[in-house]
UniProtKB/Swiss-Prot annotation:
GO terms for biological process: thiamine biosynthetic process; thiamine diphosphate biosynthetic process; thiazole biosynthetic process; tRNA 4-thiouridine biosynthesis. Catalyzes the ATP-dependent transfer of a sulfur to tRNA to produce 4-thiouridine in position 8 of tRNAs, which functions as a near-UV photosensor. Also catalyzes the transfer of sulfur to the sulfur carrier protein ThiS, forming ThiS-thiocarboxylate. This is a step in the synthesis of thiazole, in the thiamine biosynthesis pathway. The sulfur is donated as persulfide by IscS. GO terms for molecular function: ATP binding; CCA tRNA nucleotidyltransferase activity; tRNA binding; tRNA-uracil-4 sulfurtransferase activity. It comes from Lachnoclostridium phytofermentans (strain ATCC 700394 / DSM 18823 / ISDg) (Clostridium phytofermentans). This is Probable tRNA sulfurtransferase.
Length: 391
């Protein structure tokens, strides 16, 4: 039975003198994800992270938890051989093959990695010796070095490890290594995926949600909390800022041309989100927009929205088709929650014919109709926001 996992990573291994920072962040995230499942030992050795499991661990739960750790590219369940004696290694590898494959015929290739450079047998020799031993012990097997049905890998370090299967990890970079940003989170399909995608690059996220009671219900708010909880399985705890946007929305509806409602409301959402982001020491805003998907996501509309911000706005989905976004949302588990029929404030007061090519100077001129009252409403919205830690 497997008692350990060998964790592989790619990009982290290309780092220079600060590589240990990324490796330690990866170890910390692995520990965090596994902590509630039992007492796992996580260690780092020569370009690998090893996870040693308690006797009563659940294999499927452990794999699922590891597959939610950004930075991991591969997860190999391994048999640990508490010896580097060649005869012991041969015997254990043979027993492994017999236990997991029985006596059925298949083609194989032995691969070897010699992390312990003091070990007297070099990697090519390990491969040839082990292949010969397995052919002698299991005559029904045959070697195919080009297209084998199975790869049998032996790694020799302070101990020896054998494995033949590598499960795919999510890739990316460990959360916390890429700064912090503020996600504009709604109850739709796109923004949760944007949060997932930016976190995959190592960015820690907080989130801002614009609530508009009584036009949006408590169930709509709970839907967003639920989405944040799903994302937090990948990102770690998320601080969710819930902003009451009702009075601002009604005032804009009263004072501004209706075809510009969406753009102007989006501009004020960005202003508020940026203010919260600055207070939280974030380095940018994250949105789930992709070019041309709706009227507020044309290049002209995005430029008009961006114009109110001084910090960078990152849009991880900008060049993706809707189906690509849906596919990711289904894979990460947010889709079924996103399609629940509770309206966001973005879907209320939508104009029949919204402007798709807004002219910034015109938008700014029409915003003058809002006078100083809008600043008071924004201040109140910021001061009365609710902060929820979701995990």
């Amino acid at each position: 039975m497997y008692k350990a996992f060998l964790i592989k990573y790619a990009e982290i291994g290309l780092k220079g003198k600060n590589r240990h920072i990324f490796e330690n962040a990866l170890k910390d995230q692995i520990r965090f994800n596994l902590n509630k499942l039992g007492n796992f030992e996580v260690s780092r050795e020569q370009g690998r992270v090893f996870v040693e499991c308690p006797d009563d661990f659940d294999y499927d739960e452990t794999v699922a938890a590891l597959q939610r750790v950004f930075g991991i590219t591969g997860i190999s369940p391994v048999i640990v051989i508490n010896s580097t004696d060649w005869e012991d290694i041969k015997q254990e590898v043979g027993d492994y093959v017999e236990k997991f494959y029985g006596r059925k015929p298949f083609t194989f290739k032995v691969e070897a990695k010699r992390g312990n450079k003091q070990y007297p047998i070099q990697s090519p020799e390990i491969c040839s010796k082990m292949g010969a031993y397995l052919l002698d012990r299991f005559p029904e097997l045959s070697v195919d070095v080009h297209t084998p049905q199975e790869y049998i890998t032996v790694e020799v370090r302070n101990k020896a490890y054998v494995y033949s299967n590598t499960l795919k990890g999510p890739g990316g970079m460990p959360v916390g290594t890429g700064g912090k940003a503020m996600l504009l989170l709604s109850g739709g399909i796109d923004s949760p995926v944007a949060g997932y995608m930016i976190s995959k690059r190592g960015v820690t996220i907080e989130a801002t949600y614009f609530h508009a009671p009584p036009y949006t219900s408590e169930r709509a708010k709970q839907k967003v909390v639920d989405l944040a909880k799903i994302i937090s399985a990948y990102t770690g705890p998320i601080k969710l800022h819930v902003v009451n946007f009702t009075d601002i929305q009604l005032y804009i509806y009263e004072k501004c041309p209706h075809e510009e409602l969406t753009i102007i409301m989006r501009r004020y959402m960005m202003k508020i989100a940026e203010s919260i982001a600055n207070r939280s020491k974030c380095l940018g805003l994250i949105t789930g927009e992709s070019i041309g998907q709706v009227a507020s996501q044309t290049m002209q509309s995005l430029a008009a929205t961006n114009a109110v911000c001084t910090m960078p706005v990152y849009r991880p989905l900008i060049g993706m088709d809707k189906q690509e976004i849906i596919d990711i949302s289904e894979r990460i588990g947010t889709f079924e929650t996103s399609v629940l029929p509770f309206e966001d404030c973005c879907t209320i007061f939508v104009a029949k014919h919204p402007v798709t090519r807004p002219i910034l100077s015109v938008i700014e001129k029409n915003e003058l109709n809002l006078s100083e009252k809008i600043d008071e409403l924004v201040k109140t919205a910021l001061e009365t926001r609710e902060v929820i830690t979701v995990k």
